[in-house]
Amino acid sequence: MNYPTTSFPARSGAARPGEPAARAKTFPEKLGLGAGQLGLDQPPSTYRGRSPEKESAEILSIAARAGISVLDAQVSFGQAETTIGRIMPRPCPFRVTIKAGRCDRGPDYIEDEARAALRRLRLDKADAIMVQAAGDLFGQHGEAVWDRLRTLRDEGLFRAVGVSCFASDDPVGLTRRFKPDIIQAPVSLLDQRLIVSGALAEIAGMGVEVHLRSIFLQGLLFLPPDRMPTALKGASGPLSRVRRMIAEGRSDPLQAALGFALSRPEASSVIVGVASAAELQAVIAAAASPPPDLDWDEMALEDPAPLADKGWAAA
Protein backbone atom coordinates (compact mmCIF):
# COMPACT_ATOMS: atom_id res chain seq x y z
CA MET A 1 0.00 0.00 0.00
CA ASN A 2 1.28 3.44 -0.84
CA TYR A 3 0.52 5.87 1.93
CA PRO A 4 2.10 9.31 2.41
CA THR A 5 5.64 9.21 3.69
CA THR A 6 6.04 12.91 4.35
CA SER A 7 4.69 14.74 7.40
CA PHE A 8 1.89 17.15 6.61
CA PRO A 9 2.74 20.84 6.68
CA ALA A 10 0.82 23.22 8.87
CA ARG A 11 -2.42 24.36 7.27
CA SER A 12 -2.63 27.96 6.15
CA GLY A 13 -5.88 29.84 6.29
CA ALA A 14 -9.58 29.12 6.18
CA ALA A 15 -11.75 27.95 3.36
CA ARG A 16 -13.07 30.43 0.86
CA PRO A 17 -16.27 32.22 1.87
CA GLY A 18 -19.47 31.27 0.09
CA GLU A 19 -18.58 27.62 -0.41
CA PRO A 20 -21.02 24.88 0.67
CA ALA A 21 -21.06 24.38 4.42
CA ALA A 22 -22.54 20.88 4.24
CA ARG A 23 -19.12 19.39 3.59
CA ALA A 24 -18.35 18.82 7.26
CA LYS A 25 -21.48 16.67 7.66
CA THR A 26 -20.58 14.25 4.91
CA PHE A 27 -16.82 13.72 5.02
CA PRO A 28 -16.64 11.08 7.81
CA GLU A 29 -18.82 8.74 5.79
CA LYS A 30 -16.25 8.70 2.99
CA LEU A 31 -13.00 9.04 4.89
CA GLY A 32 -11.12 5.87 5.77
CA LEU A 33 -7.96 5.32 7.81
CA GLY A 34 -5.16 3.11 6.51
CA ALA A 35 -3.23 1.24 9.19
CA GLY A 36 -0.17 0.61 7.04
CA GLN A 37 1.43 3.91 8.06
CA LEU A 38 1.06 3.41 11.81
CA GLY A 39 4.43 1.69 12.08
CA LEU A 40 3.07 -1.29 14.00
CA ASP A 41 4.81 -3.72 11.66
CA GLN A 42 8.18 -1.98 12.09
CA PRO A 43 10.91 -2.58 14.70
CA PRO A 44 10.12 -1.01 18.09
CA SER A 45 10.80 2.72 18.20
CA THR A 46 9.31 5.87 19.64
CA TYR A 47 7.54 8.87 18.15
CA ARG A 48 8.17 12.01 20.20
CA GLY A 49 8.76 9.84 23.23
CA ARG A 50 5.74 7.59 22.65
CA SER A 51 5.65 4.01 21.44
CA PRO A 52 3.93 3.26 18.11
CA GLU A 53 1.29 1.33 20.07
CA LYS A 54 0.35 4.31 22.25
CA GLU A 55 0.39 6.69 19.30
CA SER A 56 -1.73 4.28 17.26
CA ALA A 57 -4.23 3.86 20.10
CA GLU A 58 -4.73 7.62 20.16
CA ILE A 59 -5.05 7.70 16.37
CA LEU A 60 -7.78 5.05 16.44
CA SER A 61 -9.56 6.84 19.28
CA ILE A 62 -9.53 10.14 17.38
CA ALA A 63 -10.76 8.41 14.23
CA ALA A 64 -13.65 6.82 16.11
CA ARG A 65 -14.68 10.10 17.73
CA ALA A 66 -14.54 11.88 14.36
CA GLY A 67 -16.86 9.33 12.78
CA ILE A 68 -14.32 7.94 10.32
CA SER A 69 -16.06 4.89 8.97
CA VAL A 70 -13.44 2.61 7.39
CA LEU A 71 -10.32 1.10 8.95
CA ASP A 72 -8.13 -0.44 6.28
CA ALA A 73 -6.15 -2.92 8.36
CA GLN A 74 -4.15 -4.32 5.45
CA VAL A 75 -0.82 -4.51 7.27
CA SER A 76 2.30 -6.50 6.50
CA PHE A 77 2.57 -8.79 9.51
CA GLY A 78 0.26 -10.61 11.89
CA GLN A 79 1.83 -8.90 14.90
CA ALA A 80 0.48 -5.57 13.65
CA GLU A 81 -3.01 -7.09 13.43
CA THR A 82 -2.64 -8.38 16.98
CA THR A 83 -1.73 -4.91 18.20
CA ILE A 84 -4.62 -3.30 16.33
CA GLY A 85 -6.96 -5.87 17.85
CA ARG A 86 -5.68 -5.00 21.32
CA ILE A 87 -5.91 -1.20 21.01
CA MET A 88 -9.00 -0.81 18.82
CA PRO A 89 -11.98 0.88 20.54
CA ARG A 90 -14.78 -1.51 21.54
CA PRO A 91 -17.36 -2.16 20.34
CA CYS A 92 -15.53 -1.75 17.04
CA PRO A 93 -16.75 1.51 15.45
CA PHE A 94 -15.14 0.84 12.06
CA ARG A 95 -15.89 -1.12 8.93
CA VAL A 96 -12.66 -3.13 8.94
CA THR A 97 -10.91 -4.26 5.76
CA ILE A 98 -8.26 -6.99 5.85
CA LYS A 99 -5.96 -8.34 3.17
CA ALA A 100 -6.08 -11.81 1.68
CA GLY A 101 -3.00 -13.99 2.00
CA ARG A 102 -0.77 -15.00 -0.89
CA CYS A 103 -2.91 -16.44 -3.67
CA ASP A 104 -0.12 -18.73 -4.88
CA ARG A 105 -0.57 -20.85 -1.75
CA GLY A 106 -4.09 -21.85 -2.68
CA PRO A 107 -7.61 -21.39 -1.31
CA ASP A 108 -7.20 -23.39 1.91
CA TYR A 109 -4.27 -21.21 2.96
CA ILE A 110 -6.25 -18.09 2.07
CA GLU A 111 -9.17 -19.17 4.24
CA ASP A 112 -6.94 -20.16 7.17
CA GLU A 113 -5.13 -16.82 7.04
CA ALA A 114 -8.38 -14.87 6.80
CA ARG A 115 -9.79 -16.56 9.88
CA ALA A 116 -6.49 -16.10 11.73
CA ALA A 117 -6.46 -12.39 10.86
CA LEU A 118 -9.95 -11.99 12.32
CA ARG A 119 -8.84 -13.72 15.52
CA ARG A 120 -5.82 -11.43 15.79
CA LEU A 121 -8.07 -8.41 15.29
CA ARG A 122 -10.55 -9.83 17.83
CA LEU A 123 -13.39 -9.69 15.32
CA ASP A 124 -16.03 -12.28 14.48
CA LYS A 125 -16.28 -10.88 10.96
CA ALA A 126 -14.97 -7.96 8.92
CA ASP A 127 -16.44 -5.64 6.37
CA ALA A 128 -14.16 -6.65 3.48
CA ILE A 129 -11.22 -8.76 2.40
CA MET A 130 -8.98 -7.57 -0.44
CA VAL A 131 -6.74 -9.40 -2.89
CA GLN A 132 -3.51 -7.40 -2.78
CA ALA A 133 -2.31 -7.84 -6.35
CA ALA A 134 -4.69 -8.07 -9.30
CA GLY A 135 -2.21 -10.24 -11.19
CA ASP A 136 -2.54 -12.97 -8.55
CA LEU A 137 -6.04 -13.71 -9.80
CA PHE A 138 -4.59 -14.80 -13.13
CA GLY A 139 -2.17 -17.26 -11.53
CA GLN A 140 -2.53 -20.99 -11.02
CA HIS A 141 -4.83 -20.70 -8.00
CA GLY A 142 -6.47 -17.39 -8.88
CA GLU A 143 -9.93 -18.65 -9.80
CA ALA A 144 -10.06 -21.09 -6.87
CA VAL A 145 -8.97 -18.40 -4.42
CA TRP A 146 -11.56 -15.98 -5.73
CA ASP A 147 -14.30 -18.61 -5.46
CA ARG A 148 -13.26 -19.33 -1.87
CA LEU A 149 -13.33 -15.65 -0.93
CA ARG A 150 -16.82 -15.32 -2.36
CA THR A 151 -17.87 -18.40 -0.38
CA LEU A 152 -16.56 -16.79 2.82
CA ARG A 153 -18.52 -13.67 1.94
CA ASP A 154 -21.69 -15.66 1.33
CA GLU A 155 -21.20 -17.40 4.69
CA GLY A 156 -21.20 -13.98 6.37
CA LEU A 157 -17.52 -13.78 7.32
CA PHE A 158 -17.19 -10.67 5.15
CA ARG A 159 -19.69 -8.28 3.62
CA ALA A 160 -17.56 -7.73 0.54
CA VAL A 161 -14.61 -9.08 -1.41
CA GLY A 162 -12.41 -6.80 -3.45
CA VAL A 163 -9.22 -6.26 -5.39
CA SER A 164 -6.48 -3.69 -4.94
CA CYS A 165 -5.18 -2.67 -8.35
CA PHE A 166 -3.21 -0.11 -10.34
CA ALA A 167 -4.12 1.86 -13.44
CA SER A 168 -2.01 -0.55 -15.51
CA ASP A 169 -4.07 -3.56 -14.32
CA ASP A 170 -7.05 -2.71 -16.56
CA PRO A 171 -9.45 -2.19 -13.63
CA VAL A 172 -12.50 -2.14 -15.90
CA GLY A 173 -11.61 -5.48 -17.50
CA LEU A 174 -10.79 -6.88 -14.06
CA THR A 175 -14.19 -5.77 -12.76
CA ARG A 176 -16.06 -7.27 -15.69
CA ARG A 177 -14.33 -10.62 -15.30
CA PHE A 178 -14.33 -11.12 -11.53
CA LYS A 179 -17.25 -8.89 -10.47
CA PRO A 180 -15.73 -7.76 -7.15
CA ASP A 181 -17.72 -5.82 -4.59
CA ILE A 182 -14.86 -3.33 -4.15
CA ILE A 183 -12.09 -1.99 -6.34
CA GLN A 184 -9.32 -0.09 -4.56
CA ALA A 185 -7.08 2.04 -6.79
CA PRO A 186 -4.60 4.94 -6.60
CA VAL A 187 -6.22 8.23 -7.60
CA SER A 188 -5.15 11.70 -6.58
CA LEU A 189 -5.13 15.34 -7.51
CA LEU A 190 -1.88 14.64 -9.35
CA ASP A 191 -2.77 11.19 -10.73
CA GLN A 192 -6.12 11.44 -12.50
CA ARG A 193 -5.56 8.72 -15.11
CA LEU A 194 -8.47 6.53 -14.04
CA ILE A 195 -10.77 9.55 -14.04
CA VAL A 196 -9.68 10.89 -17.42
CA SER A 197 -10.04 7.44 -19.01
CA GLY A 198 -13.55 7.08 -17.60
CA ALA A 199 -12.55 3.84 -15.84
CA LEU A 200 -13.62 5.00 -12.39
CA ALA A 201 -17.05 6.10 -13.57
CA GLU A 202 -17.53 2.86 -15.49
CA ILE A 203 -16.61 0.73 -12.49
CA ALA A 204 -18.91 2.69 -10.18
CA GLY A 205 -21.63 2.40 -12.82
CA MET A 206 -21.43 -1.40 -12.49
CA GLY A 207 -22.48 -1.05 -8.85
CA VAL A 208 -18.97 -1.66 -7.52
CA GLU A 209 -17.64 0.32 -4.55
CA VAL A 210 -14.61 2.39 -5.47
CA HIS A 211 -12.06 3.02 -2.71
CA LEU A 212 -9.37 5.59 -3.48
CA ARG A 213 -5.88 5.15 -2.04
CA SER A 214 -2.56 7.00 -2.48
CA ILE A 215 -4.43 10.29 -2.59
CA PHE A 216 -1.26 12.11 -1.49
CA LEU A 217 0.88 10.26 -4.08
CA GLN A 218 3.40 9.29 -1.39
CA GLY A 219 3.56 12.84 -0.10
CA LEU A 220 4.80 14.29 -3.40
CA LEU A 221 2.69 17.42 -3.11
CA PHE A 222 4.18 18.10 0.34
CA LEU A 223 7.78 17.37 -0.62
CA PRO A 224 10.16 20.38 -0.52
CA PRO A 225 11.95 20.97 -3.85
CA ASP A 226 15.35 20.21 -2.29
CA ARG A 227 14.14 16.72 -1.30
CA MET A 228 12.84 15.80 -4.73
CA PRO A 229 14.33 12.46 -5.88
CA THR A 230 16.61 12.78 -8.89
CA ALA A 231 14.27 10.66 -11.00
CA LEU A 232 11.49 13.19 -10.43
CA LYS A 233 13.38 16.41 -11.11
CA GLY A 234 11.42 16.72 -14.35
CA ALA A 235 8.21 17.07 -12.33
CA SER A 236 9.49 20.06 -10.34
CA GLY A 237 8.06 22.62 -12.75
CA PRO A 238 4.55 21.12 -12.95
CA LEU A 239 4.50 20.62 -9.18
CA SER A 240 5.46 24.24 -8.58
CA ARG A 241 2.64 25.28 -10.90
CA VAL A 242 0.14 23.12 -8.98
CA ARG A 243 1.29 24.53 -5.64
CA ARG A 244 0.94 28.05 -7.03
CA MET A 245 -2.60 27.36 -8.25
CA ILE A 246 -3.53 25.97 -4.84
CA ALA A 247 -2.10 29.02 -3.06
CA GLU A 248 -3.88 31.38 -5.45
CA GLY A 249 -7.10 29.53 -4.64
CA ARG A 250 -6.55 30.37 -0.95
CA SER A 251 -6.07 26.73 -0.06
CA ASP A 252 -3.18 24.45 0.90
CA PRO A 253 -1.93 21.10 -0.46
CA LEU A 254 -3.57 18.99 2.24
CA GLN A 255 -7.00 20.56 1.84
CA ALA A 256 -6.71 20.45 -1.95
CA ALA A 257 -5.73 16.76 -2.03
CA LEU A 258 -8.54 15.79 0.32
CA GLY A 259 -11.08 18.09 -1.31
CA PHE A 260 -10.37 16.56 -4.69
CA ALA A 261 -10.65 12.95 -3.52
CA LEU A 262 -13.65 13.39 -1.23
CA SER A 263 -15.59 15.26 -3.91
CA ARG A 264 -15.23 12.47 -6.48
CA PRO A 265 -18.76 11.14 -7.09
CA GLU A 266 -17.35 7.74 -8.11
CA ALA A 267 -15.65 7.16 -4.75
CA SER A 268 -17.33 5.32 -1.89
CA SER A 269 -14.31 5.68 0.41
CA VAL A 270 -11.08 7.65 0.49
CA ILE A 271 -8.28 5.93 2.41
CA VAL A 272 -5.57 8.04 4.03
CA GLY A 273 -2.54 7.01 6.04
CA VAL A 274 -1.12 8.95 8.97
CA ALA A 275 1.87 8.38 11.24
CA SER A 276 0.73 10.45 14.22
CA ALA A 277 -2.34 11.72 16.02
CA ALA A 278 -1.40 15.26 14.97
CA GLU A 279 -1.43 14.24 11.31
CA LEU A 280 -4.87 12.68 11.67
CA GLN A 281 -6.19 15.82 13.36
CA ALA A 282 -4.85 17.86 10.43
CA VAL A 283 -6.55 15.50 7.97
CA ILE A 284 -9.87 15.73 9.81
CA ALA A 285 -9.73 19.53 9.93
CA ALA A 286 -8.89 19.74 6.23
CA ALA A 287 -11.54 17.20 5.25
CA ALA A 288 -14.22 19.00 7.26
CA SER A 289 -13.54 22.25 5.41
CA PRO A 290 -15.51 23.06 2.26
CA PRO A 291 -13.62 21.85 -0.83
CA PRO A 292 -11.58 24.65 -2.40
CA ASP A 293 -12.71 26.20 -5.66
CA LEU A 294 -9.87 24.97 -7.85
CA ASP A 295 -9.51 23.80 -11.43
CA TRP A 296 -8.82 20.13 -10.72
CA ASP A 297 -8.29 19.24 -14.37
CA GLU A 298 -5.33 21.59 -14.65
CA MET A 299 -3.50 19.92 -11.75
CA ALA A 300 -3.06 16.43 -13.18
CA LEU A 301 0.55 15.46 -13.90
CA GLU A 302 1.40 14.17 -17.35
CA ASP A 303 4.98 13.10 -16.56
CA PRO A 304 4.81 9.29 -16.12
CA ALA A 305 7.72 9.09 -13.64
CA PRO A 306 5.84 10.24 -10.50
CA LEU A 307 2.85 8.10 -11.47
CA ALA A 308 4.79 4.85 -11.94
CA ASP A 309 2.86 1.97 -10.40
CA LYS A 310 5.92 0.69 -8.54
CA GLY A 311 6.26 4.05 -6.89
CA TRP A 312 9.44 5.80 -5.87
CA ALA A 313 11.34 6.48 -2.68
CA ALA A 314 11.25 10.00 -1.29
CA ALA A 315 14.80 11.08 -0.65
Show where each model-derived region lies.
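N-terminal binding-site loop/beta-alpha segment at the start of enzyme catalytic domains
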Residues: 1-94
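Beta/alpha (TIM)-barrel catalytic core signal, keyed to glycine-rich beta->alpha loops juxtaposed to Asp/Glu
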Residues: 9, 13, 134-314
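Short, acidic/polar
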Residues: 48-62, 106-121, 166-173, 257
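Active-site groove signature of glycoside hydrolases
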Residues: 118-137
